[in-house]
Amino acid sequence: MEYFELMFKTAKELEESIVAILEDVDSIGIAIEDNFFDESILWDYIDKSFSERNYILIKAYFDRNVDIDRIIDKIRTKIKEIFGEAKVEIEYRIIREEDWTNKWKKYAKPIYLDRIVVLPSWEEIGNVEDRILIRIDPGMAFGTGNHPTTIMCIEMLQKYLKEGMDVLDVGTGSGILSIVAKKLGGDKVKGVDIDEKAIEVAKKNAEGNHVEVEFQKNDLIDGINEKYDIVVANLIAEIILKLNANVKRVLKTDGIYIVSGIVQEKLDMILNSLRESGFKLLEVKEKEDWYTVVAQNED
């Protein structure tokens, strides 16, 4: 199968908003590379500043049968509306699915945390001692464990999840957080994502890790009536803001709410939203300019 791969060179601080735009135009997969350099990409415009550390490469994937020129025009219009004349270079090419998969193998590395080791499915490893080993193949879904937001969510699950708790993972992507929750002793664990491809990948990853997790194609928490001890959502600020207004409906009393994918410019907005929704703020964690917030439902 073939896909369009769109590549965006942009300032690191624009990452969250660019990802939101890409999700809005129905991208089926997004990858983010820091300190990038790819000789196989021939850009129309090369600027020396793009090699500096504050620039990133965002890649988005679309089905081969879409009108890619129309999508690019829509993306450029949205970027101009939000950022004006901000520097964002866009190129695209056609790739095969196996090429996309092999690129993950180049950038995905083992992650060693307090109680957990996250390992790309194709990697071999020696003795992990008493750590929990989780193997992840992202396929066409977001989430290998390498991104700071994913790492922080895993750390917060390690801290707050007690054996027998029920966990809801909103925007599950590759299923990594759902699998972590189950491995840490979660009882009923459910992962939801609006992307059908992500659900397929998450199910395969759960099978590969020999855990039972329910994965469901869903728009955030629409139609979910069960209550959970923990809700974790590694999304972007604008979507978290929407989720904040209704998430108590699926949280038990004293339930823990973990949100990540927040840049500094949007942090106060999220904190104020949580306070207005009646949450008790427990902690704010930062890693590489990304923020994770943990709150508690006192209702």
UniProtKB/Swiss-Prot annotation:
* Gene3D superfamilies, per the entry: Vaccinia Virus protein VP39
* Gene Ontology MF term list: protein methyltransferase activity; protein-lysine N-methyltransferase activity
Might you give the EC number(s) for this enzyme?
2.1.1.-
Which amino acid positions bind S-adenosyl-L-methionine, per UniProt?
T150, G171, D193, N234
Q: Which GO terms describe its biological process?
A: methylation
Q: Give the reaction(s) catalysed.
A: L-lysyl-[protein] + 3 S-adenosyl-L-methionine = N(6),N(6),N(6)-trimethyl-L-lysyl-[protein] + 3 S-adenosyl-L-homocysteine + 3 H(+)
Keywords attached to this Swiss-Prot or TrEMBL record, sorted alphabetically, are: Cytoplasm, Methyltransferase, S-adenosyl-L-methionine, Transferase
Under NCBIfam families, the record lists: prmA (TIGR00406)
- What name does the UniProt record give this protein? Ribosomal protein L11 methyltransferase
> Which gene is transcribed and translated to give this protein?
prmA
